[in-house]
């Protein structure tokens, strides 16, 4: 749990975010985007970050005229404000074609 200035404890929950990066980017740019979002979580106070680069996969249907996407899964412990700011960054990034965040129970978290 995080401590605030008032010595109140902020409860951290487990979250899983999966986002799709455009498939036409080169590998260096893709890794730069992944590291950028990982550092955003770290700087925002996320704990126990587990990042899984799932690679390029064929999509079942076209999303923003893309038939392939690069899947990235991130499991982390954080608060609601962190998730809101993280999703806002994903929403306005032109290189991200889709994202989804789920809140997880302690029982469902992936052990790393």
From Swiss-Prot:
Gene3D superfamilies: 3.30.70.60. It comes from the Eukaryota. The lineage of its organism: Eukaryota, Rhodophyta, Bangiophyceae, Bangiales, Bangiaceae. Binds together with bS18 to 16S ribosomal RNA. The keyword Transcription does not apply. This is Small ribosomal subunit protein bS6c. PROSITE patterns: RIBOSOMAL_S6 (PS01048). InterPro entries: Ribosomal_bS6, Ribosomal_bS6_CS, Ribosomal_bS6_sf, Ribosomal_S6_plastid/chlpt, Transl_elong_EF1B/ribsomal_bS6. Keywords: Chloroplast, Plastid, Ribonucleoprotein, Ribosomal protein, RNA-binding, rRNA-binding. The keyword Kinase does not apply. GO terms for biological process: translation. Coiled coil: none annotated. The gene is rps6. GO terms for cellular component: chloroplast; ribonucleoprotein complex; ribosome. One of its GO terms (molecular function) is small ribosomal subunit rRNA binding. It is found in: Plastid, Chloroplast. Belongs to the bacterial ribosomal protein bS6 family.
């Amino acid at each position: 749990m995080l401590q605030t200035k008032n010595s109140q404890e902020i409860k951290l929950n487990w979250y899983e975010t999966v986002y799709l990066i455009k498939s036409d980017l080169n590998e260096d740019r893709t890794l730069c985007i992944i590291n950028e979002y990982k550092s955003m979580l770290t700087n925002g106070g996320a704990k126990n970050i587990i990042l899984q680069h799932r690679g390029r996969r064929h999509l079942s249907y076209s999303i923003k005229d893309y038939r392939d996407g690069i899947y990235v899964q991130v499991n982390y412990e954080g608060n609601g404000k962190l998730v809101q700011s993280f999703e806002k960054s994903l929403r306005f990034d032109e290189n991200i074609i889709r994202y989804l965040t789920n809140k997880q129970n302690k029982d469902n978290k992936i052990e790393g």
